[in-house]
């Protein structure tokens, strides 16, 4: 893949997003999953993985690519392959996230790696997300994205 060196230059790129842990997304997911959870109040801890309810992208329709994701070349590198999939990941919980927490997620592109598979070129991008509240690091997560 001739553009690999240019794509590797995206390693180390970061972006930060701030959010507020509110109860509405928790109530909505509880209802969707038909759970009988008590209404979350200030200080209620998020169950594991429910941090995915926050830091949602807000792209204008004109900024969305044909694959339904944000057009390439924003935070993620402009990989010239047709499909993007989540290939795996790792999660570490350091401290609970709670309703009322002001939080910040800092995302970093850790690596961009080319491989050749049965169907041709593959590009793997590993993105690390660190989520902090006022007390410090709460969640560390890595996403393996394959193109």
Put a short name on every predicted segment.
Residues 1-14, 86-147:
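HotDog/MaoC-like acyl-thioester-processing domains
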Residues 1-102:
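Hydrophobic, proline/glycine-rich low-complexity stretches
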